[in-house]
Amino acid sequence: MLNIIWLITGILLLFAIMIHNPKSQGFGTQNQIFGSTRSAEQTLNKATWFLILLFFILTVVLSINNEF
């Protein structure tokens, strides 16, 4: 079960990183989804950091479970 969550988290993390625009202008349809560019970037940054943390925690938990 944790393996599936870890896999989904990894895929979502890749997607979140790929939709970041390096020039901080956001992605094309963000005005339709969010109220402003700044709001979209903040939400995307929070989601990305959450996924990074979740991925790291799951990686540690899965590696500990494999030892025993």
UniProtKB/Swiss-Prot annotation:
Family note: Belongs to the SecG family.
Chain segments annotated as transmembrane: 1-21, 44-64
Organism, as annotated: Guillardia theta (Cryptophyte)
Cell location: Plastid, Chloroplast thylakoid membrane
Membrane topology note: Multi-pass membrane protein
GO MF term (any one): protein-transporting ATPase activity
Role: Involved in protein export. Participates in an early event of protein translocation across the chloroplast thylakoid membrane (Potential).
Protein name: Probable protein-export membrane protein secG
Phylogenetic placement of the source organism: Eukaryota, Cryptophyceae, Pyrenomonadales, Geminigeraceae, Guillardia
Entry keyword set: Chloroplast, Membrane, Plastid, Protein transport, Thylakoid, Translocation, Transmembrane, Transmembrane helix, Transport
GO biological process assignments: protein secretion
CC annotations in GO: chloroplast thylakoid membrane
Pfam families listed in its UniProt record: SecG
